[in-house]
């Protein structure tokens, strides 16, 4: 699991553990075991309601936090721009860490101003509590909007991708923009 993809001097491991639908002691145990067997990328989100268990699993593993690439996401369906900083700080507290490697916009909505949201998230990055900003479930239109708004340094786009959903047009756009594809299935 040593292969990784790098951008802006930050490497993301090629295989990660997604924690969607993991809860309670099972989540904590799975995260700990994954790290013990060599996983170094753990993906969670406030929407998954398991950040506390993920954080405990990381602590329980004994793996140095600097060796773990940790991703979480801002839930744009419930958090509006004025609540992003508080939501992020709650995620840090739940995860028992003072930074995350990657912060994503989770499930974009059109009721939120994308430019304002990215501006706030990049402000969090400036505080060094986040190493990279990315997006999740963005289509080509939304990626183009990021560029139009001046946010050309999006680290990655986490999207559903598998043999039954190839996303070739989206992957081509991401390649043109030098945005790392992160797949879930």
Model segments located where?
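Alpha-helical scaffolding within the catalytic cores
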Residues: 1-4, 52-59, 87-90, 140-143, ...
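N-terminal binding-site loop/beta-alpha segment at the start of enzyme catalytic domains
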Residues: 1-68
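Acidic (Asp/Glu)-rich catalytic clusters
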Residues: 6-7, 33-35, 55-67, 89-98, ...
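Conserved, mostly hydrophobic/aromatic
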Residues: 17, 34, 42, 54, ...
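Active-site beta-loop-alpha junctions enriched in small/polar residues
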Residues: 20-22, 45-47, 73-77, 105-108, ...
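Short, acidic/polar
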Residues: 22-35, 80-96, 116, 141-144, ...
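Beta/alpha (TIM)-barrel catalytic core signal, keyed to glycine-rich beta->alpha loops juxtaposed to Asp/Glu
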Residues: 108-185
């Amino acid at each position: 699991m040593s292969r990784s993809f790098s951008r802006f001097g930050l490497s993301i491991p090629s295989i990660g553990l997604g924690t969607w639908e993991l809860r309670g002691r099972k989540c904590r145990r799975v995260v700990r075991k994954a790290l013990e067997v060599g996983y170094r990328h753990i993906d969670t989100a406030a929407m998954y309601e398991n950040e506390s268990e993920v954080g405990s699993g990381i602590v329980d593993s004994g793996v140095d936090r600097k060796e773990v690439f940790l991703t979480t996401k801002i839930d744009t369906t419930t958090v509006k721009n004025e609540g992003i900083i508080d939501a992020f700080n709650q995620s840090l507290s739940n995860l028992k860490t003072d930074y995350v490697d990657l912060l994503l916009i989770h499930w974009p909505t059109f009721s939120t101003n994308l430019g304002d949201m990215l501006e706030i998230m990049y402000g969090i990055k400036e505080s060094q509590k986040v190493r990279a900003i990315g997006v999740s479930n963005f289509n080509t239109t939304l990626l183009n909007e990021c560029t139009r708004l001046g946010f050309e340094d999006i680290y990655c786009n986490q999207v559903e991708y598998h043999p039954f959903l190839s996303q070739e047009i989206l992957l081509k756009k991401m390649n043109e923009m030098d945005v790392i594809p992160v797949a879930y299935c």
